[in-house]
């Protein structure tokens, strides 16, 4: 469910360790921005580098792809301006953290660092040589890769299931399905997550309210023993935590690691609310 670095079927090779979320690119240790000749246009070189990278993905580590992704976003979008991905979207969070770590880095710096990594991957690369097209292109992935790394997976309407509509916060569709098809509001996905888990994870408060109105099991636990309250707490949605508590959520339920909802959050306000609620019920 996490958005991938690459199109379906692509691989990135051995990452050689944990992915880095900042300027430390793993295989790109202490890399300095290259000197760009005055006669060359930096944006033009950047676009050529992005195009050339299509044929280098198989030799790039995951750390390098993450490093490149962050700088591509910094150039094309600017400073990180999107919410942190959901609790269990591991790849999405790594990508977001890498981009976020660039802070106010200038597009110029990001372009130079991007070009430097492409040169590191292929020291023989000559920006003046035209890239191979069509069947000659050594992409191995059926099309451009890094130039569109940041695009989220698009699911065709006919391929969507009820959980996809939940992630999209499509309240009308979910309500219609529950009403007309007598769907079990507590049905689970392969990880044991219900619609309520998903709605809490994504911060869809109105949808949470609707699901509770249709008698969603507020204390249902997923395959790891986590309740919707664990998800809302971990994602630091204070308003949803409050709503769940007011609706009867049990803050004393532990997951398989023995953690209470108050122990999976980094938000002091959420922790305090959960502790106060537990104390008040004692």
From Swiss-Prot:
Positions that bind an acyl-CoA: 69-73, 95, 114
GO CC, alphabetical: cytoplasm
Residue spans of biased composition, Low complexity class: 17-31
InterPro entries: Acyl-CoA-binding_protein, Acyl-CoA-binding_sf, Ankyrin_rpt, Ankyrin_rpt-contain_sf, FERM/acyl-CoA-bd_prot_sf
Biased composition (Polar residues): 1-12
Protein name as it appears in the record: Acyl-CoA-binding domain-containing protein 6
Assembly: Monomer.
Signal peptide: none
Natural source organism: Bos taurus
UniProt xrefs under Pfam families: ACBP, Ank_2
ACB domain sequence ranges: 42-127
Cystine bridges: none
GO terms assigned for molecular function: fatty-acyl-CoA binding
